[in-house]
């Protein structure tokens, strides 16, 4: 009898571990958003998911795909860190630098097509969807003259993410 009780208890414990937790509900009865936490090993996966998504959107719009550029990635990373320090999403660095200044500093030899930025708790794909909903940021993503892309972010301890996408030619 003791063995059977132990077996039933162990089975129940295993089944309980397999279930997904119920989401917390807000006062409106809808699930509360979950924090999107980026782990250090996620960098490549996130960058290539964004590149693939941008290129899918560009293909649907009839424009050529873009490829990653290490210098533009560096410029995007620098600006994401700087926006976090300033606690302000805007296109100028704390030293007054512009997007053009930043791509020149990292040695990018091409031309700046545009820069999209965001301060959010959303995923990269939710951020891309928000950019596609605005004519000015959509224009940067679908710019026919863009051939290169840089994409980076900084996530603060509280979960806030500072995203930067830079397009060049």
Give the label of every model feature segment.
Residues 1-7:
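Bacterial N-terminal signal peptides that target proteins for export
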Residues 14-17:
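C-terminal motif of bacterial Sec signal peptides marking the signal peptidase cleavage site
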Residues 8-12:
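Classic N-terminal secretory signal peptides
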Residues 60-74, 87-96, 114, 138-154:
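Surface-exposed patches in mature extracellular/periplasmic domains of secreted proteins
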Residues 19-22:
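Bacterial signal peptide processing site
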Residues 98-169:
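A well-ordered secondary-structure block
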Residues 25-29, 73-122:
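Short, surface-exposed glycine/acidic/tryptophan-bearing loops
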Residues 27-85:
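A short alpha-helix/helix-coil micro-patch that ends at or immediately precedes a cysteine
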């Amino acid at each position: 009898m003791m063995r059977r009780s132990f077996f039933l208890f162990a089975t129940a414990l295993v089944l309980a571990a397999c279930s997904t937790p119920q989401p917390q509900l807000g006062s409106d009865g809808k699930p509360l958003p979950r924090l999107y936490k980026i782990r250090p090993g996620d960098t490549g996966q996130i960058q290539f998911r964004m590149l693939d998504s941008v290129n899918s959107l560009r293909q649907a719009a009839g424009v050529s795909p873009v490829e990653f550029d290490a210098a533009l990635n560096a410029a995007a990373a620098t600006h994401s860190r700087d926006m976090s320090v300033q606690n302000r999403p805007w296109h100028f660095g704390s030293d007054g630098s512009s997007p053009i200044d930043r791509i020149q500093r990292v040695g990018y030899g091409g031309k700046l097509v545009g820069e999209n930025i965001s301060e959010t708790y959303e995923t990269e794909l939710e951020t891309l969807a928000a950019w596609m909903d605005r004519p000015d940021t959509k224009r940067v993503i679908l710019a026919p003259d863009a051939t290169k892309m840089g994409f980076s972010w900084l996530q603060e301890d509280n979960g806030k993410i500072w995203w930067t996408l830079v397009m060049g030619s």
